[in-house]
């Protein structure tokens, strides 16, 4: 077989690449520790706050406290939070790992930090194994794995896009696609034999790979299936044979089946209650907003170590936010050079140019196939590319096609690893009979590439640990005081009202900032976080009422406290709101940084319930919870 190196006959040799990959993973973690200056970090404090980072802190806390991300009775009280409308199940393996860290780390901050660091190890591990399987040397595979794990994409996604940081299955998907170019084909017997080859170690590994691909993120699953479809189709047409297409169909079918199993809670929710039209609705036009900008592959990464390159990267984004797509598409210096060389070499080969062969046929074929994969990714993912047609055909949940840059990055790593081996081969011929010098030369080349990758691909990513510590202590102390005042099980009403999920910031409050109460104090119940479009958005309806009216309603529902985020109001509105609440509930307690105000409603609630009586209280609560300014989507 052209793509795969032969399997060693000795069992211990089969473990050698695994042990090598483990060493590379540990070395990558050590480099990340230096880059992020982890000796300064406090593990329980999340290193990124705001935006989607708070969403994943919320998910980590839900996993640790309730064992599932799907239902959280502590949020969206009294309805509870139901996340089936967000198909996170496609990341079930990642969520399982996050739950493990939530239990071991005893807190969401530690869980998210540990998960993020673990992704560097898992990406390096799988990359090394795949490169070795493709026939690259031990040293070339180790260098390539480090470069790939240290990609700018990894740091820029970071904890804000936590699950996207786990792109360890991208190399596996790449390998499955390449395996379709040669015999023996996955899940099929060798030529001359009949039937399906179900009972073999290779079949089990292919099936496991397809299952894992369907469980580690919808984007990486779709990208991998796209490559598999491309490879199978090209090989079937080239060989005029049904076999590559059949193998392709079996892999894709198994992956799609497992993907459906993973997202079955979301599918069942839609079947039973109808589609929630208020959440997760995408349009083909969004592929133009979040598509791949091919020029971004070749420029320096954002927040580069060198000020001049950082400025150049910033200018390349342009002044119009609508056309900036997402950050993190850059390949880095080594990847940009590799992709340029690969594209030129492929063009010369396609044009039939005669030149002295620099690579042997096996290596040249591998690089050409990797280049085809990269070109296909660019054609599909680019703004104005085929992704618009894919979305128009129905695959609308995959809108940020710029993320396919991480697949392109691995194709360049394949080219780099093959090039590394070719250079060391040339050196070995010149240093024949001098093994010590040869080893030193190869080690020097590897070290140089690693140093360049470390300096170029890792930018100004060190978290501001001092500021993080101050903010964490202020927030933790404030919410702990709320818990101490009200006691476990009490219900707290969040102000201002922030719909959930995927909404624009309100003044200075992010989409998930109000989840912090649950993140810090999960024994309390919080009004924030019920799924819009499924439950009546009574807090929004209450906003239009005078303070005596809406405060009577929330007291009847069972809330005994209010936490007001001052960043969610203009100065005038904040002063008016606090004055109205204080007139009925007394003055607030504020956080050390002045952002949060807490109003104790226990005395007010007791007086209100006594005035209304049991029947009146129940009627008022039912009336308030039925209020809505939107029509639920099911």
Regions found by a protein language model. Name each.
Residues 1-39, 236, 247-254, 347-373, ...:
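Start-transfer (signal-anchor) and selected internal transmembrane alpha helices
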Residues 17-51, 58, 252-270, 379, ...:
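Transmembrane signal-anchor helices characteristic of membrane glycosylation enzymes that use polyprenol
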Residues 27-31, 114-134, 138-237, 255, ...:
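Membrane-embedded helix bundles of polyisoprenyl
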Residues 31-123, 151-167, 291, 299-326, ...:
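Membrane-interface coil-to-helix junctions
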Residues 157-165, 278-282, 286, 312-334, ...:
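Membrane-helix boundary/interfacial segments in multi-pass membrane proteins
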Residues 229, 249-257, 419-457:
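Signature aromatic-anchored transmembrane alpha helix within multi-pass, membrane-resident enzymes
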Residues 263-347, 517, 604-606:
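Periplasmic/ER-lumenal interhelical loops and adjacent helix-loop junctions
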Residues 275, 283, 288-290, 436, ...:
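Extracytoplasmic
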């Amino acid at each position: 077989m052209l793509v795969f190196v032969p399997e060693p006959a000795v069992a211990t040799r089969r473990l050698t690449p695994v042990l090598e990959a483990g060493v590379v993973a540990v070395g990558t973690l050590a480099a990340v520790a230096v880059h992020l200056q982890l000796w300064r970090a406090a593990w329980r404090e999340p290193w990124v706050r705001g935006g989607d980072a708070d969403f994943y802190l919320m998910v980590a806390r839900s996993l640790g406290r309730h064992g599932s991300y799907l239902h959280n009775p502590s949020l969206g009280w009294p309805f509870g939070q139901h996340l089936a409308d967000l198909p996170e199940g496609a990341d079930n393996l990642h969520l399982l790992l996050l739950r493990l860290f939530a239990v071991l780390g005893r807190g969401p901050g530690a869980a998210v930090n540990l998960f993020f660091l673990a992704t560097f190890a898992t990406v390096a591990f799988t990359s090394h194994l795949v490169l070795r399987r493709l026939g690259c040397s031990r040293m070339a595979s180790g260098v390539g794995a480090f470069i790939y794990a240290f990609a700018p994409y990894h740091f820029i996604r970071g904890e804000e896009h936590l699950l996207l940081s786990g792109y360890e299955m991208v190399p596996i998907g790449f390998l499955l696609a390449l395996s379709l170019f040669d015999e023996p084909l996955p899940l099929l017997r060798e030529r001359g034999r009949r039937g399906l080859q179900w009972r073999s170690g290779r079949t089990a590994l292919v099936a496991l790979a397809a299952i894992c691909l369907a469980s580690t993120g919808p984007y990486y699953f779709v990208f991998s299936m796209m490559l598999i479809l491309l490879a199978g189709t090209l090989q079937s047409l080239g060989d005029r044979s049904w076999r590559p297409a059949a193998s392709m169909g079996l892999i894709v079918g198994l992956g799609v089946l497992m993907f459906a199993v993973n997202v079955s809670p979301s599918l069942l929710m839609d079947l039973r209650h109808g589609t929630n039209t208020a959440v997760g609705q995408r349009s083909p036009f969004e592929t133009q907003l979040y598509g791949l900008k091919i020029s971004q592959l070749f420029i320096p990464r954002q927040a580069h170590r060198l000020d001049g390159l950082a400025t150049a990267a910033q200018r390349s984004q342009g002044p119009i936010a609508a056309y900036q797509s997402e950050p993190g598409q850059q390949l880095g210096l080594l990847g940009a050079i590799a992709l340029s060389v690969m594209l030129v070499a492929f063009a010369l080969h396609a044009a039939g140019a005669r030149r002295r062969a620099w690579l042997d046929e096996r290596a040249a074929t591998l690089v050409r196939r990797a280049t085809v994969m990269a070109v296909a990714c660019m054609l599909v993912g680019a703004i104005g590319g085929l992704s618009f047609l894919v979305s128009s055909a129905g695959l609308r949940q995959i809108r940020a096609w710029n993320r396919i840059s991480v697949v392109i990055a691995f194709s360049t790593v394949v080219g780099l690893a093959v090039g590394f081996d070719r250079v060391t081969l040339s050196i070995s011929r010149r240093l024949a009979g001098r093994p010590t010098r040869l080893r030193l030369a190869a080690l020097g080349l590897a070290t140089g590439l690693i140093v360049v990758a470390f300096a170029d691909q890792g930018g100004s990513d060190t978290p501001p640990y001092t500021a993080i510590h101050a903010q964490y202590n202020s927030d933790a102390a404030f919410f702990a005081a709320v818990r101490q005042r009200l006691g476990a099980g009490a219900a707290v009403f969040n102000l201002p009202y922030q719909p959930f999920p995927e909404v624009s910031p309100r003044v200075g409050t992010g989409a998930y900032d109000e989840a912090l109460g649950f993140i810090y104090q999960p024994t309390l119940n919080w009004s924030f976080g019920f799924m819009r479009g499924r439950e009546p958005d009574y807090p929004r309806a209450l906003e239009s009422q005078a303070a005596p009216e809406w405060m009577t309603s929330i007291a009847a529902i069972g809330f005994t406290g209010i936490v007001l985020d001052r960043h969610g109001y203009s100065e005038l509105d904040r002063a008016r709101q606090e004055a109205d609440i204080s007139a009925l509930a007394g003055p607030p307690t504020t956080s050390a940084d002045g952002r949060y105000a807490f109003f104790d409603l226990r005395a007010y609630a007791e007086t209100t319930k006594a005035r209304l009586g049991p029947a009146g209280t129940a009627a008022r609560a039912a009336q308030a919870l039925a209020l809505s300014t939107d029509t639920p989507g099911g």
